[in-house]
Amino acid sequence: MVGTMLTMLRPQEGECTLDLYAGAGLFTAALADAVGATGTVVSIEGSPVTHKDARSNFAPDGCSRTENSADTRIEVIRGDVARHLVDLKTALEFGEIPAIDAVVLDPSREGANRTTLERLDALDPKRILYVACDPASLGRDTGILRELGWDMVQLRAFDMYPNTYHVESVALFERAPAKPRPRRRRTK
């Protein structure tokens, strides 16, 4: 999954990335490696147990720090993702964090909700990689993202739970191109 995330999202040196519903930081670690010393990764997780693991993993001497991510700015935040997206919007407006380039969104089986997706959209990231473990939730959230002006440009599915209906999906969203306004015909 990490390789798929990196291939599809294409995080670059110096970018600012978000890892939402980050758990202990599987994707955070790979993002930190990719954005390097000049990049930023903001990791948000609601579970106190996995948040504690993430804080330990990404401490300056943490086990998930590599040579390439030793100096990466990694913010590990515990709490409700939707609420913290409001805080990030404020931090952006005050220049406390750079513009957001890429987002990994890996919610629970229920998926994200409209409020979370609207608040994420307000941050104006360039790319969103949605990792979903329920196709129905991904379908619902894709509809919301489409309403907000995002296009799904790539989709991969993984049968990680053989002989069950569970499918892990990874979808890349980018801003839909602006639609030209239709020209009005002049009548004489």
Per-segment meaning from a language model:
Residues 1-188:
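Rossmann-like S-adenosyl-L-methionine
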